[in-house]
């Protein structure tokens, strides 16, 4: 049976990662968290106090401490920078609020996209992000673009933060998500937009199971036809 490439794009907190992880597990595919890669680069920038003018130093740190993914005993995915487990650190609010400017740096995107394409070559992979279907995997057999209202996405982020013990204010989250949407869709390099051949799916009011079922059925149909 042919293993395909699945690209899931969408704005912040549209459910991309949650859905992608479940589908990868169900299909026996590899899940590549591209957002975690950009968050890791952002974590490096913030930890060392680097600005957008010091891209070479961020890349140097990435080379010294490469991004890798490992599985925890419970099956969840851990993110490492070199030997440092940054799984929780890269989800903190300061990283979330700065990832847009770091991910907009052309040199950072070029390096991480190169890594992502190399990993995806063999197929049997599902990636989520903001430019997977348009830039990273334009040849993906299935492209999905998830959308949801700012209100619903802020509520999801608020619940996620509660579960992780991160303090947050709902109204502030709404403002931050709206600002992130604007930054991501207006950046010069790889702006957030759906691929022309992507299936657009509004997840507002739709359960995770409902979104998973929709995408998985599309994937299985493509596999059956190939």
UniProtKB/Swiss-Prot annotation:
What is the name of this protein? Cytidylate kinase
Q: Which NCBIfam families match?
A: cmk (TIGR00017)
State the UniProt keywords alphabetically. ATP-binding, Cytoplasm, Kinase, Nucleotide-binding, Transferase
GO terms classed as biological process: nucleobase-containing small molecule interconversion; pyrimidine nucleotide metabolic process
Tell me a Gene Ontology molecular-function term this record carries.
Answer: ATP binding
| Residues binding ATP, per UniProt | 10-18
Catalyses: CMP + ATP = CDP + ADP; dCMP + ATP = dCDP + ADP
Q: Which Gene3D superfamilies match?
A: P-loop containing nucleotide triphosphate hydrolases (3.40.50.300)
- Write down the PANTHER family for this protein, in alphabetical order: CYTIDYLATE KINASE (PTHR21299:SF2), CYTIDYLATE KINASE/PANTOATE-BETA-ALANINE LIGASE (PTHR21299)
Q: Which family does it belong to?
A: Belongs to the cytidylate kinase family. Type 1 subfamily.
Q: Where in the cell is it found?
A: Cytoplasm
**Could you name the Gene Ontology cellular component terms for this entry?**
cytosol
Q: What class of enzyme is it?
A: transferase
- The answer, when asked if Disulfide bond is one of the entry's keywords, is no
Identify the species of origin: Streptococcus pyogenes serotype M4 (strain MGAS10750)
HAMAP family per record = Cytidyl_kinase_type1
Q: What EC number(s) does this enzyme carry?
A: 2.7.4.25
């Amino acid at each position: 049976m042919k293993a395909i490439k699945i690209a899931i794009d969408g704005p912040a907190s549209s459910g991309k990662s949650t859905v992608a992880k479940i589908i990868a597990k169900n299909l026996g595919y590899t899940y590549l968290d591209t957002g975690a890669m950009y968050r890791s680069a952002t974590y490096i920038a913030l930890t060392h106090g680097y600005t957008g003018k010091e891209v070479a130093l961020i890349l140097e740190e990435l080379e010294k401490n490469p991004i890798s993914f490992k599985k925890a005993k419970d099956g969840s995915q851990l993110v490492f920078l070199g030997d440092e487990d940054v799984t929780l650190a890269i989800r903190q609010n300061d990283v979330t609020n700065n990832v847009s400017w770091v991910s907009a740096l052309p040199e950072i995107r070029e390096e991480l996209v190169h890594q992502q394409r190399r990993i995806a070559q063999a197929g049997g992979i599902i990636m989520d992000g903001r430019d997977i279907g348009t830039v990273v995997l334009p040849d993906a057999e299935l492209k999905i673009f998830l959308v949801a209202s700012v209100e619903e996405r802020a509520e999801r982020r608020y619940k996620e933060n509660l579960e992780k013990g991160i303090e947050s204010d709902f109204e502030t989250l709404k403002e931050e998500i709206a600002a992130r949407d604007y930054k991501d869709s207006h950046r010069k390099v790889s702006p957030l937009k759906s691929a022309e051949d992507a299936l657009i799916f509004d997840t507002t009011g739709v359960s995770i199971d409902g979104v998973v079922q929709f995408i998985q059925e599309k994937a299985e149909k493509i596999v059956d036809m190939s």
